[in-house]
């Protein structure tokens, strides 16, 4: 798929007060949507404080073995996972955010059944960071390249929360709206020509794994920090494992949040159980406790 025209559609937005149906409708039509005021900025500030305390231990640039040529990972970006252990607010608030789950239910329930996390990740674009090459997140799973994007079920939904303001000049996520139904191929475009998801703290960008996108170049003098929460059908193996989370922490989480991090049985649309233990439900077999929502 060669991207030639610079007359790209705008990234449409709704206010969270308009409801998840309004956001889902645009997501279906464009492959991406900005939802304004979807979460209290104070919640994001608490997560940001937790992240900043350990940011100096995070990976700078690409990890060994990563296919860096696909998305142009470089030494001016910091990637950080392990958010379940890093932030109680992330565990309690973000993993249970009602608006997010309303959208995810609409996307996955009919075609796939239950969903869980692919990963929760911090992407810190430092000053001087170059733009990523436009790409699709679905390419993480090779089967996606044998599927017709226009008719196949979604394999991933990314919900990105800005931890500080997202602008075109500081590396705000660049997207090509309506690209989610185009053919599978390499993508060629001047990333800087794509529209940027400009957002304030408390907003969120939701886009499908089929939507062509990439991190923008940071030409400002301050970092641009985002938290990406990626969800996928429960029949796909997540990128990030949470087996390192101690049981005593897991048992402080809701059943929904536990399932999101892989500590729970998921059901396909045909109700078959996956991630079971001793042929029993995960919680039953382990006697796993949980917190009431």
Curated annotation (Swiss-Prot):
Its cofactor is Fe cation. Pfam families: PhyH. Disruption phenotype: Impairs the synthesis of anditomin but accumulates preandiloid B. Its EC number is 1.14.11.-. Keywords: Dioxygenase, Iron, Metal-binding, Oxidoreductase. InterPro entries: Fungal_Metabolite_Diox, Phytyl_CoA_dOase-like. Coiled coil: none annotated. GO terms for biological process: terpenoid biosynthetic process. GO terms for molecular function: dioxygenase activity; metal ion binding. Pathway: Secondary metabolite biosynthesis; terpenoid biosynthesis. It is an enzyme of class 1 (oxidoreductase). Fe cation binds at residues 135, 137, 213. It comes from the Eukaryota. Dioxygenase; part of the gene cluster that mediates the biosynthesis of anditomin, a fungal meroterpenoid. The first step of the pathway is the synthesis of 3,5-dimethylorsellinic acid (DMOA) by the polyketide synthase andM. DMOA is then converted to the phthalide compound 5,7-dihydroxy-4,6-dimethylphthalide (DHDMP) by the cytochrome P450 monooxygenase andK, which is further prenylated by the prenyltransferase andD to yield farnesyl-DHDMP. Further epoxidation by the FAD-dependent monooxygenase andE leads to epoxyfarnesyl-DHDMP. PANTHER family: PHYTANOYL-COA DIOXYGENASE FAMILY PROTEIN (AFU_ORTHOLOGUE AFUA_2G03330). Belongs to the PhyH family. Homodimer. This is Dioxygenase andA. It comes from Emericella variicolor. The lineage of its organism: Eukaryota, Fungi, Dikarya, Ascomycota, Pezizomycotina.
């Amino acid at each position: 798929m060669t991207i030639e025209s610079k007359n790209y559609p705008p990234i449409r937005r709704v206010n969270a007060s308009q409801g998840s149906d309004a956001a889902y409708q645009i997501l279906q039509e464009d492959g991406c949507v900005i939802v304004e005021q979807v979460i209290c900025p104070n919640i994001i500030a608490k997560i940001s404080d937790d992240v900043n305390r350990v940011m100096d231990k995070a990976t700078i640039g690409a990890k060994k073995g990563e296919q860096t040529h696909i998305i142009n990972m470089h030494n001016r970006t910091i990637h950080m996972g392990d958010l379940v252990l890093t932030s109680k607010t992330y565990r309690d608030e973000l993993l249970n955010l009602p608006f997010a789950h309303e959208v995810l239910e609409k996307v996955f329930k009919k075609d796939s059944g239950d969903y869980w996390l692919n990963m929760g990740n911090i992407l810190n674009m430092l000053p001087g960071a170059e733009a990523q090459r436009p790409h699709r997140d679905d390419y993480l799973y090779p089967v996606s390249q044998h599927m017709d994007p226009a008719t196949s079920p979604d394999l991933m939904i990314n919900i990105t929360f800005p931890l500080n303001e997202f602008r075109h000049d500081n590396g705000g996520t660049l997207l090509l709206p309506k690209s989610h139904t185009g053919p599978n191929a390499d993508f060629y475009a001047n990333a800087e020509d794509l529209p940027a998801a400009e957002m304030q703290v408390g907003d969120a960008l939701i886009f499908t794994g089929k939507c062509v996108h990439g991190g923008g170049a940071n030409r400002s003098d301050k970092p641009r920090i985002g938290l990406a929460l990626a969800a996928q059908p429960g029949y796909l193996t997540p990128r990030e494992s949470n087996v390192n989370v101690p049981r005593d922490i897991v048992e402080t989480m809701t059943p929904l949040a536990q399932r999101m991090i892989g500590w729970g049985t998921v059901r396909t649309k045909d109700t078959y159980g996956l991630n079971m233990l001793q042929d029993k439900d995960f919680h039953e077999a382990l006697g796993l406790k949980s917190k009431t929502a």
